[in-house]
Amino acid sequence: MAQERRGSREDRQNREERDSEFVDKLVAINRVAKVVKGGRRFGFAALVVVGDQKGRVGFGHGKAREVPEAIRKATEAAKRDLIFVPLRGGRTLHHDVHGRHGAGKVLLRSAKPGTGIIAGGPMRAVFETLGVHDVVAKSTGSSNPYNMVRATFDALKNQMHPKDIAAQRGMKYATLQSRRVSAGVASEE
């Protein structure tokens, strides 16, 4: 009975294959200073968004003395903290949602095919890594990238699949979809 070692070559190759499915975007990088007895010690803080472009996305924050190390730490943190977001037709959100974090507020709206990603800065990175192709987003309040990303994730966590909404309301999914079609909204799954 041969047991595999923890850091075996196969394990490393499997991890690299799993990581290759993710797309990462650097959202922000800051130079930070720690004041010590002899002066200031400089370091870097990075904010990274990671996603598989199929509905899973996460963000991470990493700090280190060198930029590449901070980015690596942030990327690892993002991969550990992924969330799943249901997408309509694999291209847009199911319904409009609000999110907030601190003084930052965001409004995310589903859009028709061909609209594209109409969103600024940090929110665009989240949607590109998530796999959303058509969305309209508006941010108000804080323009701090950390707050905007966290507010966007708050909104995405509130996103529900129509099947879940139907179950919550105690009605059939087909009834909910027929109401959607009769309201003039194109039905896509």
From Swiss-Prot:
Subunit structure: Part of the 30S ribosomal subunit. Contacts proteins S4 and S8.
Similarity comment text for this entry: Belongs to the universal ribosomal protein uS5 family.
Function field: With S4 and S12 plays an important role in translational accuracy. Located at the back of the 30S subunit body where it stabilizes the conformation of the head with respect to the body.
GO molecular function, one term: structural constituent of ribosome
Protein name: Small ribosomal subunit protein uS5
Domain S5 DRBM: 22-85
Pfam families, per database record: Ribosomal_S5, Ribosomal_S5_C
